[in-house]
């Protein structure tokens, strides 16, 4: 019962924070931040779905290396084993897609800085294309799952005959596959973070002291990605907990509850990377309506005014010559 309450609270907080962040991105972003708002909206949408699936299943995971047992305790139990297995797989799928989108957002930031603003329809199209492999992968596992497959005797784990439990070869290999993919994708996020951080720093060095606002922009970007790189640590910790239980390094009594709870902190903490370090959103929250001095937004392209200034000076000189 306590575990279900904790899960309900975490899922509610995850949905609420990400829904609020989505609201800010959709309604409080200036025109220059439209690409950024689209990136944030897609990410928060994925976090919301992950939180909903976590609440739907409220799973515990037990393994001794030879088998993996998923014990759902959420609303999915009212719809049968197949619904719980689908919810279990979708939760892991959304967590993985969230990490993939983080990598994509780093690439988009590079593109925005050095090339131009990508159209929003292109961002949506890329997000859709990135989801196709995961959806095909999930559909394959769903087709293999047999809800009538018998599980081993679970009395040694303190699980009564009346409790729903998901087990068997499909559950075993699908869990192993997805958890391994989560670990690899989280590692790739760290690699992408190192790359984009070096890119932002080198961009600031190239600009030198010509544009002070550019330095402020890059400082904000670095703060955002410094916070975001902390998010995969929850995935790492959850996977390490699972691996430790899988290899019998730790007992299942507490580890079975820890894995899903640890995973949930990734979507919960994600909105704070924007709320804390993007001035426009932060000012909306604290009720600050005006900025004393305009600054370029963190996701907008850097525009140089040098050419415009030179044209204006040339035109003015021409008018003066005509007057004389």
From Swiss-Prot:
It comes from the Eukaryota. Gene3D superfamilies: Rhodopsin 7-helix transmembrane proteins (1.20.1070.10). The keyword Transmembrane applies. Residues 303-324 have a biased composition (Polar residues). It is a multi-pass membrane protein. It is found in: Membrane. Pfam families: 7TM_GPCR_Srd. InterPro entries: 7TM_GPCR_serpentine_rcpt_Srd (IPR019421), Nematode_rcpt-like_delta (IPR050920). The chain crosses the membrane at residues 5-25, 38-58, 83-103, 124-144, 176-196, 227-247, 258-278. Residues 290-324 are annotated as: Disordered. One of its GO terms (cellular component) is membrane. Keywords: Membrane, Transmembrane, Transmembrane helix. SUPFAM superfamilies: Family A G protein-coupled receptor-like (SSF81321). Belongs to the nematode receptor-like protein srd family. This is Serpentine receptor class delta-30. It comes from Caenorhabditis elegans. The lineage of its organism: Eukaryota, Metazoa, Ecdysozoa, Nematoda, Chromadorea.
């Amino acid at each position: 019962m306590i575990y279900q309450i904790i899960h309900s609270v975490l899922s509610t907080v995850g949905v609420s924070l990400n829904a609020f962040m989505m609201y800010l991105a959709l309604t409080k972003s200036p025109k220059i931040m439209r690409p950024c708002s689209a990136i944030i909206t897609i990410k928060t949408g994925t976090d919301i779905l992950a939180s909903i699936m976590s609440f739907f299943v409220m799973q515990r995971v037990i393994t001794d290396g030879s088998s993996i047992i998923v014990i759902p305790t959420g609303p999915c139990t009212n719809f049968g084993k197949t619904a719980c297995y689908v919810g279990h797989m979708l939760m892991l799928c959304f967590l993985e897609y969230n990490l993939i989108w983080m990598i994509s957002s780093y690439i988009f930031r590079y593109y925005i800085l050095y090339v131009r603003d990508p159209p929003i329809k292109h961002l949506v199209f890329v997000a859709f294309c990135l989801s196709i492999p995961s959806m095909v992968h999930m559909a394959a596992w769903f087709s293999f799952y047999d809800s009538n497959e018998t599980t081993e005797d679970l009395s040694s784990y303190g699980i009564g005959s009346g409790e729903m439990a998901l087990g068997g070869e499909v559950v075993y290999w699908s869990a192993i596959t997805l958890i391994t993919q989560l670990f690899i994708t989280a590692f790739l996020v760290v690699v992408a973070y190192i790359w984009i951080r070096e890119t932002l720093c080198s961009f600031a060095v190239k600009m030198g002291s010509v544009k002070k606002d550019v330095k402020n922009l890059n400082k904000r970007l670095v703060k955002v990605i410094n916070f975001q790189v902390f998010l995969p640590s929850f995935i790492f910790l959850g996977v390490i907990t699972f691996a430790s239980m899988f290899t019998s390094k730790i007992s299942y009594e507490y580890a079975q509850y820890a894995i899903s709870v640890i995973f949930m902190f990734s979507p919960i903490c994600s909105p704070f990377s924007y709320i804390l370090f993007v001035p426009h959103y932060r000012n909306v929250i604290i009720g600050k309506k005006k900025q004393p001095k305009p600054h370029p937004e963190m996701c907008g392209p850097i525009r140089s005014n040098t050419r415009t200034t030179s044209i204006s000076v040339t035109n003015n000189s021409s008018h003066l010559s005509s007057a004389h």
